């Protein structure tokens, strides 16, 4: 079943979102109820993209500089930062082009603008897909390091990590190109949504299992030292908080965008769904926010990486 033409270019739909000041306001629909629409100005969108761009560039530079960080785990973290970097680049590039076109500073033929939009859409979509892939890869790497600790270095070798990374990038580019080409097909939308749900379930299962195992390990240590309750409760709260942050940030930042895709597939003309469609730009902004938060969760918690990051900053300073 084809999707309605008004939603044909999903990632390009941001082009039709008018610039406005940030506020929460009701937007009346001619045939449906009032809608709450959060308008994201181009300036704010551009600032978020630039912050993410700088942050993830520093992560990639720090990992590339320090040979001690050239391990499979940090390779996955570096690729996640690179994916988030591409999300930022595509967002900044698209917003900048729109601002220049709107101001009349950039004159281009409609066909050129359309081709540029398609390139940006493929870049943005492939970076999103690869980002989800690498989040899942990091979860699997951590799972293996905990449950197969003695065999970890024989299972997760640098050569295998490189092959996995190459396969992820190839799959991301191919699937994104197909998605942009067939974005007017419901099957294409649902495939992307199923992929997101699969990554969400994978991460939830792996991290919950890791939390359970670590909690049992902490209980065993506590029993040996005859102080079970305080250690057990304290560690349990810390582990639960970490798990909540990991999965909560992932769901809150990515969930609305994939809800948008789901609703386009199942109710493109329903008034309530149309209200949600109005916030498409907000959903993209949340993905850019995720690109800002990812380094804080996965990269900057490493003492070795923070030390190298300081050296990189001092070099440029």
From Swiss-Prot:
Region (Disordered): 1-23
GO CC terms in record: plasma membrane
TM region(s), chain numbering: 38-63, 73-93, 119-140, 164-183, 192-211, 241-266, 280-300
UniProt GO BP: adenylate cyclase-activating G protein-coupled receptor signaling pathway
Glycoprotein keyword on record: yes
Main localization of the protein described in the UniProt heading: membrane
Membrane topology field: Multi-pass membrane protein
Annotated Pfam families: 7tm_1
Residues of the signal peptide: none
Glycosylation sites: 29
Subunit structure: Interacts with MGRN1, but does not undergo MGRN1-mediated ubiquitination; this interaction competes with GNAS-binding and thus inhibits agonist-induced cAMP production. Interacts with OPN3; the interaction results in a decrease in MC1R-mediated cAMP signaling and ultimately a decrease in melanin production in melanocytes.
Similarity comment: family membership: Belongs to the G-protein coupled receptor 1 family.
Functional summary from the UniProt entry: Receptor for MSH (alpha, beta and gamma) and ACTH. The activity of this receptor is mediated by G proteins which activate adenylate cyclase. Mediates melanogenesis, the production of eumelanin (black/brown) and phaeomelanin (red/yellow), via regulation of cAMP signaling in melanocytes.
Record-given protein name: Melanocyte-stimulating hormone receptor
Biological source species: Lemur catta
